[in-house]
Amino acid sequence: MEAKRPEQTRVVVGMSGGVDSSVTALLLKEQGYDVIGIFMKNWDDTDENGVCTATEDYQDVVQVCNQLGIAYYAVNFEKEYWDKVFTYFLEEYKAGRTPNPDVMCNKEIKFKAFLNHALTLGADYVATGHYAQVKNVDGQYQLIRGKDPNKDQTYFLNALSQQQLSRVMFPLGHLEKKEVRAIAERAGLATAKKKDSTGICFIGKRDFKEFLSSYLPAQPGEMQTLDGEVKGTHDGLMYYTLGQRQGLGIGGSGEPWFVIGKNLEKNILYVGQGFHHPGLYSEGLRAIKVNWILRRESDEPFECTAKFRYRQPDQKVTVYPQSDGAVEVLFAEPQRAITPGQAVVFYDGDVCLGGGTIDHVLKKKEDRESA
């Protein structure tokens, strides 16, 4: 297919009211594209004491779009967000895991519901302020790390498909954050000095425990060591994540205590003393709901690197594809506090191969289900 010239190419930009998406729209406009800005409203904050900044954020989008001279709309994706992201978030916590809503939001909202809406506006592409790059190599789309190692967001984009990537532009992928700020300031954008948002959008500044308890009933239970010694009571397994140190309330002298495991059936929270407690370490993991961005030609084991949390340095691993579509991953070095529910994301150099959801850890390499 012959590539269209920029002025004949419509790009719909997902605008959050932040500096990254503002500069994304600016760069595309400067390159001559036909740009439309869309503000996604994903969460109903009317009953949440006005903690969410949606109204303020939309005003910033309006200001920036007026500065750039581009059309803008607000689109409501609250139902899709509730059904696809928030329900998943609660189900995972109920199952004792610690989910990553950003991965699901990118897969189901930003690059599905939003992309589909953009196509109805005649979009050729959608663009966002993510720090990542997409490269077309012989008709196959590769997801490549952003230039700024501190901001690279391929970890959160690991669930995207070829079809989604074929319609995506990431104009900030080759820039560092400080360059993006400088571009915004030079252009006098209304959002140039706005702070980056952090945390989970639907929780805002509220206390996480309080927020979760308003949706899921808490079941307090015993806090025990692996030997069965009771060290206190927990407020509900869903409030704790592996490796957590804060909020355990275990007194006494010596090294601090950490969460090292959960028993859902017996409602027991396992704790261990010391940062390097053996219960915190594992030699492998099993991941489910695996997405390969580039189709794998074989089910043979292969070596690559992986991240088990955002901003973690790459770790060497061997991946063993399973017949059910899951993978077992063995680590070159034991890993600390691997958390079920989080994403494991695979890399070959700077190319993101895909990822999956951590189902459980393998304490010993011999725990592998396949020979």
UniProtKB/Swiss-Prot annotation:
Catalytic activity: S-sulfanyl-L-cysteinyl-[protein] + uridine(34) in tRNA + AH2 + ATP = 2-thiouridine(34) in tRNA + L-cysteinyl-[protein] + A + AMP + diphosphate + H(+)
Gene Ontology terms: cellular component: cytoplasm
Catalytic residues in the record: 105 (nucleophile), 201 (cysteine persulfide intermediate)
Family recorded in the similarity comment: Belongs to the MnmA/TRMU family.
Source species of the chain: Halalkalibacterium halodurans (strain ATCC BAA-125 / DSM 18197 / FERM 7344 / JCM 9153 / C-125) (Bacillus halodurans)
Taxonomic superkingdom: Bacteria
Subcellular location: Cytoplasm
UniProt KW tRNA processing keyword: yes
Keywords for the protein's UniProt record, in alphabetical order: ATP-binding, Cytoplasm, Disulfide bond, Nucleotide-binding, RNA-binding, Transferase, tRNA processing, tRNA-binding
Name of this protein: tRNA-specific 2-thiouridylase MnmA
Gene name, Swiss-Prot/TrEMBL: mnmA
Broad class of the protein's primary localization: cytoplasm
